[in-house]
Amino acid sequence: MTSIKPIHNGKKVIVGMSGGVDSSVSAYLLMQQGYEVEGLFMKNWEEDDTDEYCAAADDLKDAQAVCDKLGIKMHTVNFAAEYWDNVFEYFLAEYKAGRTPNPDIMCNKEIKFKAFLEFADDILDADYIAMGHYVRRRDNSDGSVQMLRGVDGNKDQSYFLYTLSHEQVARSLFPVGELEKHEVRDIAKQMGLITHDKKDSTGICFIGERKFTDFLATYLPAQPGDIETPEGEVIGKHQGLMYHTLGQRKGLGIGGLKDSNEDPWYVVEKDLLRNVLIVAQGGNHPRLMSQGMTVNQLHWVDRKGPATDSQLVVKTRYRQTDVPCRISFDDPQRITVIFDSPVAAVTPGQSAVFYDGDVCLGGGIIDSLIRG
């Protein structure tokens, strides 16, 4: 069993209980550390009576069972209105504009570490909040805090949390960030928690098990158009640019073509003006590669950000291998990033997150690409 030295005895922590194993073990570990722990379950999506996909009821039941087992209070709160206004509307607007958004990042920014923290403060009188994210917090001698990658490199979630402010990190605890995933499941099993073997949630929470294209079509009208090669040859039809992202290989519906080789086809560009999807063969096709990018809507955890001309590493998507790069500031809210070597399938609308070693510095939204 993992033992962690008691700290901050008696301080009150409100744990975001999702009904999953990570938040379950987070609550247990914080109790072991001497905190006064209570759970708070968020309902972020209002499904209708015919919605078979949302597991919120099951998750609530599991969260309550864990809190009962641990002997702690559990509260519930409905953030569906805030979620719709601040996460879902953004999600739709980005897809409508031809970009590929990341709603999980926006959910962390607007709901889990904003609305949740405000509720925990105003209603539950919290000293801290805690989540089951795989990141670490470092407390420095000067009173500052930093956000670090989780110990489990395969589960590290710092990419999704780069928008957190210094103040939010200072008010947040991340117990499972110090552990490997298998250790978390082992602890849950030893404690007899119902969530010990529960499958990890994947995908976008409000879509659940639904087919993504079907879900999106209920909110945004599809606009079919041509699929072209870089040379302008029409080789197929798409059902809507919003259903495709740069670097996509599957689901293009392109069969064997006369005079083409057997290399797979990849999306290399979305021509919004003409409503044309441009595809090319080979994962290293020049049209798929970028030498760099511009990034705007910047957010730095320490508020200052790195110095211009800093040598850092960046992730342009979750679980991507670190990409060495150099950054320069065009203005306080825009940087130019040059990669040490070309990178495939960098996607406007997605987040670029920067690191100095294990420290997550922050990041921003990919705006445009720099081609060779």
Swiss-Prot record:
GO biological process, alphabetically ordered: tRNA wobble position uridine thiolation
Tell me which Pfam families the record gives. Answer: tRNA_Me_trans, tRNA_Me_trans_C, tRNA_Me_trans_M
- Determine if tRNA processing is one of this entry's keywords: yes
Q: What class of enzyme is it?
A: transferase
Could you tell me which residues belong to the region Interaction with target base in tRNA?
102-104
EC number(s) on file: 2.8.1.13
Intracellular or extracellular location(s):
Cytoplasm
Superkingdom as given in the UniProt entry = Bacteria
Q: Which residues bind ATP?
A: G16, M17, S18, G19, G20, V21, D22, S23, M42, G132
- What name does the UniProt record give this protein? tRNA-specific 2-thiouridylase MnmA
Give the species. Answer: Shewanella denitrificans (strain OS217 / ATCC BAA-1090 / DSM 15013)
